[in-house]
């Protein structure tokens, strides 16, 4: 999960209205802060008995950030709360009595405010408002022209083909483009044989992927999670560390070499 955060432009953190902020919620919040991901909050299951919007907003402000603002409230109340989160918003409130959408989008992008929405995903309550806010209060990142990508996942398809999942962070990645990188003390020069744009288990092959695209690439045999290609630097060590260790005891007659090969694949896919 942490590996994915490094390639997100924005995040929606879903919190149970019946449970409130839990330990894992705080962990996710720290990770989002570490990677500087602008975040919207959706407090779900508000249709259940005992879900108290006012109490939840107080908890969010105290445990996560004082910049959590209720966007389900009337616009006037929302803007008054926004005025406490930034000088530009305060100036707009004093001069015009309202905060512009552009100002709010800038504040969200700078993590100066965290919009909160309440509803029920099961009953589609509050979902439309959240989607509208994502459309209104998000900004398209400005990517550099210099080519760069960040690897965040390794997996294999149903046929066993090795997939390198990456985000293009600058320039354009083209199919069959040569990619040079260092791994395990050696330098490798390989080609991006296929660029796949996935939707569920289905994918569409691309000729090229522009900056901001997330694609799965075949043809890279030694890529690894956190690898930076081109102008992109290698990712820093993850914050989360495993707290449990496991021992695998093979049954009599098992092929240790085959087991090791499979374990190496698992290690690639989940290096933690």
Description of each model-found segment:
Residues 1-272:
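Structural and coupling elements of P-loop NTPases
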């Amino acid at each position: 999960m942490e590996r994915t955060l490094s390639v997100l432009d924005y995040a929606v953190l879903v919190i149970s209205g019946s449970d409130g902020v839990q330990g894992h919620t705080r962990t996710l919040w720290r990770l989002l802060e570490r990677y500087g991901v602008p975040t919207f909050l959706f407090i779900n299951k508000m249709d259940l008995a005992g879900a108290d919007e006012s109490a939840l907003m107080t908890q969010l402000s105290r445990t996560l950030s004082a910049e959590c603002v209720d966007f389900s409230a009337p616009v006037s109340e929302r803007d008054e709360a926004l005025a406490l989160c930034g000088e530009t918003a305060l100036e707009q409130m004093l001069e015009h009595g309202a905060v512009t959408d552009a100002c709010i989008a800038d504040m969200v992008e700078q993590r100066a405010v965290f919009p909160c929405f309440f509803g029920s995903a099961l009953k589609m309550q509050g979902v439309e408002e959240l989607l509208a806010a994502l459309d209104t209060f998000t900004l398209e990142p400005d990517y550099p022209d210099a080519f760069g990508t960040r690897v965040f996942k390794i997996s294999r398809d149903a046929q066993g083909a090795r997939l390198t999942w990456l985000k293009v962070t600058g320039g354009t990645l083209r199919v069959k483009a040569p990619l040079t990188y260092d791994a395990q003390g050696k330098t490798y020069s390989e080609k991006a044989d296929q660029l796949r744009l996935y939707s569920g288990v289905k994918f569409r092959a691309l000729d090229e992927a522009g900056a901001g695209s997330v694609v799965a690439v075949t043809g890279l045999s030694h890529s690894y999670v956190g690898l930076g290609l081109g102008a992109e630097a290698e990712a820093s060590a993850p914050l989360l560390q495993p707290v449990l260790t496991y021992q695998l005891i093979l049954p009599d007659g098992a092929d240790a070499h085959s087991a090791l090969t499979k374990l190496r694949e698992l290690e690639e896919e989940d290096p933690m």
